UniProtKB/Swiss-Prot annotation:
Residues 77-107, 344-364, 392-426 are annotated as: Disordered. One of its GO terms (cellular component) is chloroplast. Keywords: Chloroplast, Coiled coil, Plastid, RNA-binding, Transit peptide. Residues 406-426 have a biased composition (Basic and acidic residues). Residues 92-101 have a biased composition (Polar residues). The keyword RNA-binding applies. Residues 1-72 form a transit peptide. This is Uncharacterized CRM domain-containing protein At3g25440, chloroplastic. It comes from Arabidopsis thaliana. Residues 346-357 have a biased composition (Acidic residues). Its main location: plastid. It is found in: Plastid, Chloroplast. Gene3D superfamilies: YhbY-like (3.30.110.60).
Amino acid sequence: MGFLTAAIRVSTSAASMLLRRKSRQLGFLASSSPLFSSFNSMNRTISSCNIVCKVLHKESLTRPMWNVSFLRSSSFHSTPARETGDDDISKSENSSSQDGDSCTKLKRKKLKGKRAVVRWLKFFRWKKKKEFERMTSEEKILNKLRKARKKEERLMETMKKLEPSESAETTHDPEILTPEEHFYYLKMGLKCKNYVPVGRRGIYQGVILNMHLHWKKHQTLQVVIKTFTPDEVKEIAVELARLTGGIVLDVHEGNTIIMYRGKNYVQPPTEIMSPRITLPRKKALDKSKCRDALRAVRKYIPRLEQELQLLQAQAETKRDYTNVKVDDNQERSEELKKIIERSEECLEDEQEEDEAGLELATDSDLSDIFETDSELEDAKTERPLFLEEFEKFPAINNREDEDFGDLGKAKSEGEENDDDKSPNFDEVDKMFLRAAFLLKKKRR
């Protein structure tokens, strides 16, 4: 019995020594391992028995404690966890992934929702606007010119895509008309009221179909085109004659094509009435939009080039003739000052004249303007009586009373001898002389 007790004591002492060493090692592992980071975040102690069961024996913590009751005395406190190499590994992986992504194109984050898209577009426009404001005048023109040329190339590509796939290989062999027939059909076409309008789409399947439907009952037809130039109208006339097989009689007023269907006209099948060579309605509209945009861009590019040349020329003149420019500006400023002073003086004179005119407009002047009816009646009553008597004399003289008898002759002879000039009688003198002449006639 004594031997057994001694052996047990030796074994327990050896086991306690081993457990102390293991506890120190386990304490270091627990402080450095990420397994117990959650435990380290909580301010509490960790018993060594739980660690021994979990790490050494790899058993569950729900094991009955009677098997390891002798380990309860040895315990340690947890310490803050140290940073391990896992974070460094994750960082290195992220950096390597970023390097790999930099080689390839960075994918833009997908925007979720309409508001996010609108917000991104607003920011993009604001950024472009600020960049444009920071540019110089020459850089602005160059930027506009670059954009215009890119737009021209893009429109040319879209125009090529909108061209019909099948090539137009149909040939036109029109009938020969005599001058009399041509005159007759042209007169008929000018009088007829049936017409086909051609809008901004130009020639497409619907226009040709409409023409054939008109030719079903009428020989002549008017094609009215108001959205193209006269040269383009002539090209459209040639194209319509080729596609429909009709005869172009005349282009009236530069916008109306008069066409004749032909002598032996028969309504063709639907494949010819709406040929695939031409564009459908939607594509014709897209082509017209591209054509208008291309025309506008081609007008805009030379204007920008001209502005750029003027700007460069102004910059060169500023470098060469800096003093001359300053003198010119000074002279212009002086001229402007003189013009402003003259205008101010003219305004002052006009104001003075207006004030003087207002002072002259007295009550008596206004009374002359606003005369009453009673005053006019008084003036009529105050008319002299001899004027009424003279009005009774005949007005027609038949050029006989120009001499006014002997008195007039004597008077005129005396004046001729004195001054050798023709007499100038007043109306009253003429009336008196005429009255005297008539009285003499009555006495005779």
